[in-house]
Design a protein with these regions (language model features):
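Non-catalytic, solvent-exposed segments at the cell envelope interface
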Residues: 2-13, 17-378
Length: 378
């Protein structure tokens, strides 16, 4: 599984910010499913906070290169030789933002969890990729910094543009949540099952104390042993926060977050429709998205028709390093952006012959120029 481990030094790539980090990806898949159930069963037009995005402002790169056969490399070939979007996949950006109020979902909050969920609409297979929050990338404004700054500067639109420009993706939809969503979702499902190891155990309860205080939840239940066990919403959120004493630090934390998604999917498939509807009613006000009810209805008709089949992290483990980039602090650095993007398209779309856009080449050259003198200097 790509991107799950790293050497011990990589844990320095992420600093403690003394705040609760939110994990949108843990709830993306199930929120879509719950939205369908809610809209169908109650026939209500109410739902998440929805925004319309202009696709022309989302930084979708033009691909004009062709391979030796004349077919477009990395996508379907249009009449003019440029890439056209492969409608067999739906790519959705997922943001967890450090917002403590509903308005913080719109702009001004950093996205401390960034993921891409790619859904194969023909098979129902879903692949998940974490984009590590401290990755040094073009923010969509020709400014380079940690990629989680994009959401703070221009909200979801700029964050999507950042992903599309740097990764040659065609994302036009997103879901963003605040931190209360994960707690409410897991509790509504009756808890989820994960395997807690000894390094994680000693930090879960400390994070529970902090989260309980910040959210004024009125108490917490300590996790007392290691092993495969049921966690409630607060415990699961604390589990997603743990990175200290993990061999890969923040990289292993991102892997744990993806494990939580799979646990939520598994639990949701065992839950009756009436309970799922109640859960959606609970979390609906904590969601900000571009996905309309019609698109949701077109996408999802049967919860059992979708399966998470693979997951990984970007930059890929063998093609990343870390470095303190001056005033920008400790960053995750794609050693070669072009190679990482080729890997990403092979991983998500089984495209073995992908050729990156000129935009990715330009971004990669700038990243190398900015970071070469800082790499591995702690």
């Amino acid at each position: 599984m790509a991107g799950n481990n790293s050497n011990g030094g990589t844990r320095k790539a992420s600093k403690s910010k003394g705040k609760i980090v939110i994990f949108a990806i843990e709830i993306l898949l199930i929120l879509i499913m719950l939205a369908i159930l809610f809209l169908v069963m109650t026939k209500s037009g109410e739902g998440p906070k929805v925004v319309d995005l202009n696709t022309e402002d989302l930084g979708i790169n033009e691909i004009s290169k062709t391979d030796s056969t004349g077919a477009n490399a990395g996508g379907q070939n249009g009449a003019d030789g440029t890439q056209v979007i492969d409608t067999g996949y739906l790519n959705v950006a997922l943001f967890g933002v450090d917002a403590t109020t509903p308005n913080g979902l719109f702009k001004g909050s950093r996205s401390d969890c960034i993921m891409v969920a790619s859904v194969n609409k023909n098979t129902g297979d879903i692949k998940l990729v974490s984009v590590y929050r401290d990755t040094y990338l073009n923010l969509g404004t020709d400014t380079y910094n940690k990629c989680n700054h994009a959401y703070a500067g221009g909200g979801a639109e700029q964050a999507i543009k950042m992903l599309n420009m740097n990764l040659d993706l065609d994302i036009t939809n997103f879901i963003a949540v605040n931190y209360q969503s994960l707690i409410d979702l897991v509790d509504g499902l009756g808890g989820i099952y994960v395997d807690v190891n000894k390094n994680e155990l000693k930090h879960i309860n400390n994070y529970q104390i902090t989260i309980n205080k910040d959210l004024n939840l009125g108490g917490y239940t300590a996790v007392k042993e290691t092993g495969y066990q049921k966690l409630n919403g607060l415990q699961a959120t604390a589990y997603c926060r743990v990175r200290y004493d993990l061999p890969g630090g923040d990289f292993d934390r991102a892997s744990n977050q993806r494990e939580v998604i799979k646990a939520i999917e598994e639990q949701a498939k065992k839950t009756d429709p009436a309970t799922l509807t109640k859960v959606f009613n609970k979390v609906v006000d904590e969601i900000y998205t571009s996905i309309s009810s019609k698109d949701l209805l077109d996408l999802v008709t049967n919860i059992n028709g979708y399966s998470i089949v693979d997951e990984g992290g970007f930059p890929e483990e063998s093609m990343r390093t870390t470095g303190n980039i001056g005033a920008k602090g400790s960053c995750v650095i794609p050693v070669d952006l072009e190679s990482n993007v080729v890997w990403l398209h092979k991983f998500l779309f089984d495209d073995a012959d992908y050729a990156v856009s000129n935009t990715v080449k330009e971004c990669g050259a700038k990243i190398k120029s900015d970071t070469s003198s800082y790499i591995n200097k702690r």
